[in-house]
A protein has these predicted regions:
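N-terminal, post-signal-peptide region of Sec/Tat-exported proteins
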Residues: 50-76
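Bacterial N-terminal signal peptides
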Residues: 6-15
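Electrostatic cytochrome c docking/interface patches
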Residues: 17-36, 46-54, 60
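Short, solvent-exposed mixed-charge patches
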Residues: 146-147
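A generic structural signal for secondary-structure junctions
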Residues: 9, 47, 69-72, 105
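Axial heme c-ligation environment in periplasmic c-type cytochrome domains
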Residues: 50-55, 76-99, 105-133
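Positively charged n-region of N-terminal signal peptides that target proteins for export
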Residues: 1-4
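C-type cytochrome heme c attachment motif
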Residues: 33-45, 62-66, 101-105, 123-125, ...
Length: 147
């Protein structure tokens, strides 16, 4: 199993709670560039008022507005895969910087480890190859739509 994912999950499970004062450590400007290269084919960032902050018009992936600190698999109106719903809605997976990085770099592998289920699947097949890009994308999403 990917050692990065195991390391992240161990740290996440050791943490007692998600702090309200969370932040992102990446470069949001570089994250905007990476988001526009790697994420816009599937995702948008649209406010609750309907203002599009990023992306095109794709709806194959969920709206990523306010993803930082949100429960995984819980955006209203999007049909998530069963494994992600179980991880987030049923087991409380929150998109912290660490969990976001681990997930976007290997969605299926992350869910298999998090759920301890070899049959876990992810609807997201794309993988962000570079950790730095994933960190920067999280910083960008945090900046334009943090709760």
């Amino acid at each position: 199993m990917n050692r990065f994912i195991v390391f992240i999950l161990a740290g996440m499970m050791a943490s007692s709670a998600w702090a309200d004062g969370h932040s992102a450590s990446g470069d949001a400007s570089a994250g905007e560039v990476a988001f526009n290269k790697q994420c816009v084919a599937c995702h948008v960032v649209v406010t609750d008022a309907g203002e599009k902050l990023a992306g095109r018009n794709s709806k194959s992936g969920p709206n990523l507005y306010n993803v930082a600190g949100a429960t995984a698999g819980a955006v209203p109106g999007y049909r998530y895969g069963k494994s992600l719903v179980k991880a987030g809605v049923e087991l409380g997976l929150i998109w912290t910087e660490e969990t976001f990085l681990a997930y976007v770099q290997d969605p299926k592998g992350f869910l298999k480890v998090f759920l301890d289920d070899k049959k876990a699947r992810a609807k997201m097949s794309f993988k962000v190859r570079k950790e730095e890009d994933a960190r920067n994308i999280y910083a960008y999403l945090y900046r334009i739509g943090s709760k």
